[in-house]
C-alpha cells in the first residue's frame, strides 16, 4: 500500500528531524565541536546528527554518570589525539566505536576499586 509506505517515510523523517534538534541542543555536540571532532559541515548533515543523538549520546550519558562531564571531556580529548583520516570521514561510527570500547573499561575499573 503506497499510503502506508508514504506515512512510514514521513514518520521516519519526523523522527530523524527530532533527533537532529535534540543533537543541536546537546552539550555533547558542543564538546565535540570544541575538540574539533565535529566540523561545521557535520552540523549540516542530518544523518550524522541523528546518528550521534540516537547511538552515541546515550553512551556519553552513561560515561557521565560514571565519571562526570570531565570524564566525557577526557575521553573526547583522548580519541581526538588517536583520530586518523578514515575516522574523520566516518565520524559518527568512530565516536560510537570509541565509546563502546571505553565504557566496559570504565565499568571494570569501578568494580575493581570497590
What are these regions (language model features)?
Residues 1-114:
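Electrostatic interaction modules used in gene-expression and signaling proteins
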Amino acid at each position: 500500500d503506497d499510503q502506508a509506505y508514504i506515512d512510514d517515510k514521513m514518520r521516519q523523517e519526523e523522527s530523524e528531524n527530532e533527533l537532529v534538534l535534540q543533537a543541536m541542543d546537546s552539550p555533547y555536540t558542543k564538546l565535540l565541536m570544541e575538540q574539533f571532532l565535529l566540523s561545521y559541515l557535520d552540523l549540516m548533515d542530518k544523518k550524522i546528527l541523528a546518528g550521534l543523538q540516537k547511538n552515541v549520546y546515550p553512551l556519553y550519558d552513561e560515561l557521565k554518570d560514571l565519571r562526570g562531564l570531565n570524564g566525557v571531556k577526557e575521553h573526547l580529548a583522548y580519541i581526538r589525539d588517536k583520530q586518523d583520516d578514515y575516522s574523520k570521514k566516518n565520524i559518527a561510527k568512530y565516536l560510537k566505536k570509541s565509546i563502546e570500547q571505553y565504557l566496559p573499561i570504565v565499568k571494570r575499573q569501578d568494580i575493581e576499586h570497590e
